[in-house]
A protein has these predicted regions:
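Membrane-proximal helix-turn-helix segments that form the acceptor-binding/catalytic region
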Residues: 118, 134-175, 189
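Aromatic "clamp/platform" in nucleotide-sugar-dependent glycosyltransferases that forms part
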Residues: 322
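Short alpha-helical donor nucleotide-sugar binding micro-motif in glycosyltransferases
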Residues: 78, 301, 309-314
Length: 421
């Protein structure tokens, strides 16, 4: 059985096999785990096609990797590779549509894997952000064309375009795979003629073994970990609003945010940078207004090992996003046994049971509810240990590499049997 994958980024395995500069192990992290599990399947011939900045190919551990710059290469590549099935990871990127058309023209079945549900991500992108930060004038759009920033109206336009591409790709889909009640419902609406196959994700191997999280005596200085805060869907603004209630009881509490801090090039350029990065400006002003600026720290970008350590050093993991499907960061935190507090949106309730495996709060923008959930964990006599252990047990089932690989192979076999009875 020969399966061709299309992925939107150059995976670390592909970069190594093709002799390219190292790719980030953050991008496409769910694919690296799934790929590692599938390599052991003796009856599977796997070709992984990545979209990158230069053409390259190579083979490692029995997997053939191809990196292409131009989607015009897809049709001849299919003729050369002659796979039995094309598996497209993601629905909203331009090469997905090109590959789907090329595969159908060659008479090949196409399986789409739903990642985020862009329809809902676009709808909730700027929830809770004041209008004055969401709209930028003509001058700032002109500057943005020369020196790109992060104007929120541009970001909204981009998300809306991704949602439209997702809808177009799924409208003609015959086979889709997902993993939550949320994406299943989305596929029922967006891909009404498709057969839906459930299949969970396999995460980065580093998070399955080694030291687990343990509660510590944090006294007045608990650490709250937010895995991303650079754009409004991740809802940093609501976390900032929740901080005063936490600080009222734990005066030295710290919010750690994985990623780069807001750009600062000194007082002369600061007004321009602030206008070019309005969401960061809003969060900066909000933190200053609430008196919590000194309690917020950015870690800088973290590779897998550093991110693992960040989980272990935290006391509570936060995921207050306005929309998520099956966030890898939540799965990783659960695998390590870290107590989790998350918004009850999208696919999150399919991953974590409220009250036993972590705490979910209803409205993502409800800062009071978020603060109460965080304080409930911090107040618990065991520091959230019991919830963390239950979360780890659940995550070991959800992200079981061998089972997920077997499920995916069964999906391939079922589709091919239907196509060639």
């Amino acid at each position: 059985m020969h399966i061709l994958w299309l992925v939107r980024t150059t995976l670390p395995q592909a970069a190594a096999a093709c002799g390219l500069a190292g790719a980030s192990d953050v991008s496409g992290s769910w694919l690296t785990g799934q790929l590692a599990a599938l390599r052991a399947c003796p009856d599977l011939h796997l070709t992984v096609l990545c979209v990158g900045k230069e053409d390259a190919d190579g083979t490692a551990d029995g997997v053939h990797y191809r990196v292409v710059r131009d989607t015009a290469a897809f049709a001849p590549l299919l003729q050369a590779e002659r796979p039995d099935l094309v598996h497209i990871w993601g629905t909203e990127f331009d090469p997905a549509a090109v590959m789907a058309d090329a595969a159908r023209a060659s008479g090949l079945p196409v399986l789409f894997s739903v990642q985020g549900v862009m329809r809902d991500c676009a709808a909730h992108l700027c929830d809770g952000v004041p209008e004055k930060y969401r709209r930028s004038g003509a001058l700032w759009h002109t500057i943005d064309k020369i020196i790109p920033g992060e104007l929120l109206d541009n970001m909204q336009t981009s998300f809306d375009a991704l949602a439209a591409k997702e809808a177009a790709a799924l409208a003609d889909a015959r086979y889709v795979t997902g993993r939550t009640a949320f994406d299943r419902a989305a596929c029922a609406a967006l891909a009404p003629h498709a057969r839906y196959y459930p299949c969970n994700e396999t995460l980065r191997p580093l998070f399955y073994t080694g030291t687990l999280w343990h509660a510590r005596d944090f006294a007045a200085a608990p650490v709250l970990l937010l895995p991303q805060g650079n754009y409004p869907l991740k809802n940093l603004h609501t976390v900032i609003k929740a901080l005063p209630a936490v600080l009222a009881e734990y005066g030295d509490a710290e919010l750690r945010i994985a990623g780069w801090p807001p750009l600062d090039k000194g007082p002369l350029l600061r007004p321009v940078i602030d206008r070019m990065f309005p969401y960061k400006l809003y969060c900066k002003r909000l933190a200053a207004q609430l008196g919590v600026t000194e309690h917020i720290r950015y870690t800088g970008p973290l590779d897998a090992a550093a991110m693992r350590q960040a989980y272990l050093e935290a006391d509570v993991f936060l995921l207050p996003s306005g929309c998520e499907n099956s966030p890898n960061s939540l799965g990783e935190a659960m695998l390590l046994g870290l107590p989790c507090v998350a918004s009850a949106v999208g696919g999150i309730p399919s991953m974590l049971a409220n009250g036993t495996e972590g705490l979910l709060y209803g409205d993502a923008l409800d800062a009071d509810a978020l603060a109460r959930a965080v304080l409930q964990v911090l107040h618990s006599p065991d520091g959230g240990t019991a919830m963390g252990r239950a979360a780890r047990a659940r995550a070991l089932q959800t992200h079981d590499a061998a089972r997920n690989a077997a499920d995916l192979l069964h999906i391939y076999e079922s589709i091919l049997q239907e196509e060639h009875p």
